[in-house]
């Protein structure tokens, strides 16, 4: 785009909204800017007419570098730019399309997605599709929420029998219980029965023989049968017995060889009751010479309540651990074997060492028991698990439960002297606990044990997802949601045992189970006191040696590995007092010395957890408050700095305004002085006497040798247009010079200079407006093509019209090609060709066109536009234009005072369509005749020749597209202009009108003359 600088005192600048004085301004589509305001609104880059920039509707100027690029195609947007308000992204009108249907987005309504812009139709379709998908997912999820139906126990599966050495004590109650259990499975789809084995050892304590005999007589719930170990395994793992590998049987061969003589099983009936606790009775078997080892099925992380001090009633109440959500979803998922041994034997393998302080704590914890049970064969709710537990020996070290109900360690040499080694008992037997494990776990048991014994193998708690167990006969596998402990977990040491063994709790009196509500243990393992001595640490280390999986839900008692001798291998300290073990009964037994079953501790733990949560909230709130205070302080500093910057800018603005006022006053003073000087020089110019045409040399002295170029072309014309010199003066001979060497203007002809009448020297004080520092000296003889007046050049060539004008017109009118050339006199020719033609005309010594040099003829025949450009440039560079300075004001006043532009428009050929216009037309002709009387004869002749030539071009306007109005606009700057070029813009309309009137009516004008 381009803009034109104009002078208009009545308009305002678009950018600064200040009035525009006579300084240079830019005008574009009725919008005007100061010269200093015509810059890019983003980068303040100076713009001009040749710059590539955009103009917004509000008048904002944007240069090409700052214009927006399309986000999609990356091209510069030169028309309408669509900018998204959210992301400030720009799109061209072609790329503003929907990414799905590729249609143009209507009404600027769109939805932005990850793929791109979407029209509203596609967006609504997408929303409906998502809503339909969400509804389908909701329906599917509601259909899947149904309770898991447990499969019925197969009636073909035989009940597990009991083998007794030589005899069997079967009461009538056993048969009734068995029948009730079978019928309950058929009628109520309850979970399978739980078998609790009661094994008898060959030795027992003497002080409990009487109690054993009495309790054996009262036992009414045992169902004894004799069966082999192989039958037990086959009946237990019925569904996967074919896939158990032979290696698993070989591993159990040692245990089968050392198995006790008889095994007693009790068939316990599960009930639909509260699953929070399990009460397991330990009835005595009538054998005074045997040590009763009994196994009970318990929950993970069990805790044992103690009996009262009267020792009348004795029971084991196993509490289920309470997780963080106070909800147990899988009770009795992992039944464990509890061996109750009353015989004091030297510990072997994973010996448990309890300190004296621990023993005292055990004794002091007698008062925190729940109510005792009084029925014999009643087990509180045991569901979803069936367990077959076998008789074991006392090879592993055990915790004994004393008669008063408190746990205690056997007083062995290992307890009193931990540094000494104790010889193993000769009657040691291998103790194993068989459970319903899957074939994969049994198959991999040997490799896992070897990995745990590997000194380089790090032992960690097994996650829930890694467990591979068999949950029982037809019991669905469900995981229990247990919140992970934040503390570090206790590392599992080498040589872990697969089962947990407890000492036998002495039983007294009748075994009945009263109705009671058992509370869940809230403290679990996390409330263990940290104040433990070195013996407690060693005890925990040995307790942690029992191999229990940390998984919840599906794990049950695992095959027990042979015990290892205690040694330095197990002396590594525990890393934490808290652990995620779910099945470590030994660990919980040792930690029961801290009264874990107190209901008060449950409340304290809940209070501590709540207090910890409040402390964390307070801590984070305080950190947030500190951060906000720092932000406020930083913002206050920024505000102070910005206020200081604003104050500095305000002071700078005041200083600049003062400077502007001072410069404005100085400018007004200089303008007034320049106007006075101009008036004086105009008076001097009018007083110059004009001689007759015969004395051309005297007449040439009154006119400057160079015409001023209007300020408009001076600013916006290219550099090549300025580089036009007087080529003829460079080739002139020394004899033709009347005084010294002539300076030739290389860029522009300097402004007209007043020449004194007598000595023909330039008048001092006149400052040329042309930026060119060089000027042409006056040549009165007319030998210079450029620099000589029209009269002097015609006198030099002895013709009425200069040869350059005649040659150019003849070349254009030579054939129809020149006259029919589109854009004739409007399009510019090659700058190089134009300069070459001018140089040849300046060097041409012949004064006749028919004797032109061959080179000049060849140049003239190359391009018609170049020939037309040469003609226009010569007319524009005349020191005194064709319509000379002497008649300039008279012509302008004729148009302006009579309002000819409005009263006599020249828009068509029939402008004389009314008598009033005819009268005005005749008045204008008479006025022009009077004015042309002052005009020199050479000027009149050139004007006639040009008018006739333009008439011919005008008649071919259908092909060359140059009508009279267009030709007048092209030739007006070359035919008429003021003395110093200051009125070019102000008088532009009047100049164009008078040129068009003269060229269109030249016959009427010169006919009357």
Swiss-Prot record:
Q: What GO biological process, any one, is recorded here? A: small GTPase-mediated signal transduction
* Rho-GAP domain ranges (all copies): 788-1006
Answer whether the UniProt record assigns the keyword Repeat to this protein: yes
User: Which GO-annotated molecular functions does the record name?
Assistant: GTPase activator activity; identical protein binding; metal ion binding
What keywords is this UniProt entry annotated with?
Answer: GTPase activation, LIM domain, Metal-binding, Phosphoprotein, Repeat, Zinc
Q: Where is the composition biased (Basic residues)?
A: 481-491
Q: Which domain of life is it from?
A: Eukaryota
A Gene Ontology cellular-component term: cell tip
LIM zinc-binding domain: which residues? 11-68, 69-129
Q: Which CDD domains match?
A: LIM1_Rga, LIM2_Rga, RhoGAP
Q: Which InterPro entries would you find in this protein's record?
A: Rho-GAP (IPR050729), Rho_GTPase_activation_prot (IPR008936), RhoGAP_dom (IPR000198), Znf_LIM (IPR001781)
Q: Where is this region: Disordered?
A: 143-228, 358-433, 449-608, 664-709, 723-780
For the modification Phosphoserine, the affected residues are 763
Relate the protein's function as given in its record: GTPase-activating protein (GAP) for CDC42 and/or RHO1.
Q: What is this protein called?
A: Rho-type GTPase-activating protein 2
Organism per entry: Saccharomyces cerevisiae (strain ATCC 204508 / S288c) (Baker's yeast)
Q: Which gene encodes it?
A: RGA2
């Amino acid at each position: 785009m381009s803009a034109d600088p104009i002078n208009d005192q009545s308009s305002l600048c678009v950018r600064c909204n200040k009035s525009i004085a006579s300084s240079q301004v830019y005008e574009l589509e009725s919008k005007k800017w100061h010269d200093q305001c015509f810059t890019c609104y983003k980068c303040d880059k100076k713009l001009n007419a040749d710059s590539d920039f955009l103009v917004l509707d509000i008048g904002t100027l944007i240069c090409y570098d700052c214009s927006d690029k399309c986000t999609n195609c990356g091209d510069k947007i030169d028309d309408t730019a669509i900018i998204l308000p959210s992301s400030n992204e720009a799109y061209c009108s072609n790329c503003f399309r929907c990414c799905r249907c590729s249609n143009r987005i209507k009404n600027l309504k769109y939805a932005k997605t990850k793929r791109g812009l979407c029209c509203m139709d596609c967006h609504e379709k997408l929303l409906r599709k998502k809503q339909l998908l969400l509804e389908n997912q909701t329906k599917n999820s509601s259909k899947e929420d149904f309770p898991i139906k447990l499969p019925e126990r197969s009636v073909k599966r035989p009940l597990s029998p009991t083998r007794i050495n030589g005899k069997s004590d079967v009461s009538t109650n056993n048969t009734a219980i068995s029948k009730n259990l079978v019928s309950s499975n058929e009628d109520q789809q309850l979970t399978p029965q739980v078998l609790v084995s009661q094994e008898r050892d060959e030795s027992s304590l003497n002080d409990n023989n009487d109690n054993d005999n009495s309790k054996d007589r009262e036992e009414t719930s045992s169902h004894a049968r004799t069966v082999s170990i192989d039958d037990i395994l086959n009946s237990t793992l019925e569904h996967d017995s074919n896939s158990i590998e032979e290696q698993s049987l070989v591993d159990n061969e040692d245990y089968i060889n050392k198995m006790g003589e008889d095994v007693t099983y009790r068939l316990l009936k599960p009930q639909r009751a509260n699953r929070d606790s399990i009460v397991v009775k330990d009835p005595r078997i009538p054998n005074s010479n045997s040590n009763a080892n009994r196994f009970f099925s318990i929950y993970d992380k069990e805790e044992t309540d103690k009996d009262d001090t009267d020792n009348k009633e004795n029971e084991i109440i196993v509490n289920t651990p309470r997780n963080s959500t106070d909800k147990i979803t899988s009770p009795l998922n992992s039944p464990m074997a509890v061996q109750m041994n009353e015989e004091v034997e030297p510990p072997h393998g994973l010996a448990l060492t309890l300190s004296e302080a621990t023993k005292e704590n055990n004794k002091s914890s007698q008062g925190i028991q729940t109510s005792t049970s009084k029925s014999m064969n009643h087990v509180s709710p045991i569901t979803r698990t069936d367990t077959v537990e076998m008789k074991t020996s006392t090879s592993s070290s055990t915790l004994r439960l004393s008669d008063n109900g408190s746990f205690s360690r056997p007083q062995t040499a290992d307890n009193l002297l931990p540094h000494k080694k104790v010889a193993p008992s000769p009657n040691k037997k291998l103790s194993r606990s068989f459970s319903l494990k899957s074939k994969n776990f049994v198959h991999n048991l040997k490799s896992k044990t070897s990995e745990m014994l590997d000194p380089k193998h790090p032992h960690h708690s097994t996650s829930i997802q890694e467990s591979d167990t068999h949950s029982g006969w037809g019991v669905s596998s469900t995981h229990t949601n247990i919140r992970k402990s934040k503390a570090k977990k206790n590392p599992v040491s080498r040589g872990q045992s697969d089962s947990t063994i407890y000492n036998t709790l002495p039983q007294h009196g009748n075994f009945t189970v009263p109705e009671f509500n058992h509370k869940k243990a809230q403290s679990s393992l996390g409330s263990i006191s940290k104040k433990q001595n070195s013996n407690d640490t060693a005890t925990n280390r040995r307790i942690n040696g029992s191999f229990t999986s940390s998984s919840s839900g599906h794990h049950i008692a695992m095959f027990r590995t042979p015990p290892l001798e205690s040694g330095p291998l197990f002396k590594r300290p525990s890393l934490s007092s808290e652990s995620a073990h779910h099945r470590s009964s030994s660990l919980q037994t040792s930690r029961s010395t801290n009264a874990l079953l107190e209901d008060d501790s449950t409340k304290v733990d809940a209070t501590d957890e709540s207090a910890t949560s409040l402390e964390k909230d307070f801590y984070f709130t305080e950190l947030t408050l500190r951060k906000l205070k720092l932000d406020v302080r930083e913002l206050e500093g920024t505000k102070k700095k910005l206020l200081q910057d604003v104050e500095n800018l305000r002071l700078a603005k005041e200083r600049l305004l003062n400077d502007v006022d001072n410069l404005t006053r100085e400018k007004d003073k200089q303008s007034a002085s320049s106007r006075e000087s101009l008036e004086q020089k105009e008076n001097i110019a009018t007083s110059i006497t004009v001689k007759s045409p015969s004395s051309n040399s005297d007449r040439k002295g009154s006119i400057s040798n160079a015409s001023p170029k209007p300020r408009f072309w001076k600013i916006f014309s290219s550099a090549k247009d300025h580089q036009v010199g007087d080529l003829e003066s460079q080739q002139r001979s020394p004899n033709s010079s009347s005084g010294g060497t002539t300076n030739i203007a290389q860029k522009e002809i300097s402004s007209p200079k007043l020449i004194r009448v007598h000595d023909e020297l330039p008048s001092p004080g006149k400052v040329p407006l042309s930026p060119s520092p060089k000027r042409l000296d006056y040549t009165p003889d007319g030998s210079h093509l450029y620099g000589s007046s029209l009269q002097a050049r015609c006198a030099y060539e002895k013709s009425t019209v200069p040869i350059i004008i005649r040659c150019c017109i003849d070349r254009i009118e030579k054939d129809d090609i020149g006259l029919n050339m589109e854009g004739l006199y409007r399009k510019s020719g090659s700058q190089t060709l134009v300069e070459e033609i001018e140089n040849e005309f300046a060097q041409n010594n012949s004064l006749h066109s028919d004797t032109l040099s061959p080179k000049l003829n060849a140049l003239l025949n190359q391009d018609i536009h170049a020939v037309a450009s040469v003609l226009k440039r010569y007319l524009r560079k005349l020191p005194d234009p064709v319509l000379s300075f002497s008649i300039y004001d008279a012509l302008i006043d004729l148009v302006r005072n009579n309002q000819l532009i409005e009263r006599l428009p020249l828009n068509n050929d029939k402008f004389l369509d009314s008598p009033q216009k005819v009268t005005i037309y005749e008045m204008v002709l008479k006025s022009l005749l009077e004015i042309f009387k002052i005009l020199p004869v050479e000027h009149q002749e050139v004007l006639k020749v040009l008018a006739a030539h333009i008439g011919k071009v005008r008649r071919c306007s259908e092909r060359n597209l140059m009508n009279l109005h267009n030709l007048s606009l092209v030739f007006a700057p070359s035919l008429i202009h003021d003395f110093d070029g200051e009125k070019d813009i102000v008088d532009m309309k009047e100049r164009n009108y008078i040129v068009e009137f003269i060229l269109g009516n030249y016959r009427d004008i010169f006919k009357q003359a």
